[in-house]
A protein has these predicted regions:
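Asp-box/BNR beta-propeller blade signature and adjacent active/binding-site loops
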Residues: 1-118
Length: 118
């Protein structure tokens, strides 16, 4: 489910189901970041409609209209997640794994695209 605000969160449009972003009603995260001199978006969540499993990161370069690439970060349990861009340009992600344990991983944006960093 998504809703969009164009005024800094004062008002929101109607909530919509996003077929490209299956979710078992678990907090997900969208990160807007700079990559190759343009704004891109990364989305992290458990990619399942029924279980908190398959922690996946998806990539959009068109303002979240489409999600053109994705990579599986964690095949097992995956709950709440939060991403940030680190000082070295990589993406850091903190997520809930098995037994409510917190895990941290980092990766370059190219990893989500299935490519090696240049």
């Amino acid at each position: 489910l998504t809703a969009v605000s164009g005024d800094g969160g004062e008002t929101w449009n109607a909530v919509e189901q996003q077929e490209a972003l299956p979710d078992p009603e678990c907090q997900s995260h969208v990160l807007r970041t700079r990559w190759r001199e343009k704004d891109v978006y990364l989305f992290s969540n458990p990619e399942s409609e029924t279980s908190r499993v398959r922690g996946t990161v998806k990539f959009s370069s068109d303002g979240t209209d489409t999600w053109t690439s994705k990579r599986l970060l964690e095949p097992g349990e995956f709950g709440y997640s939060c991403m940030t861009q680190l000082p070295d340009g990589q993406i850091g992600i903190l997520y809930e794994g098995s037994d409510i344990t917190q895990y941290f991983a980092k990766f370059p944006v190219e990893w989500v695209l299935g490519a090696s960093p240049e």
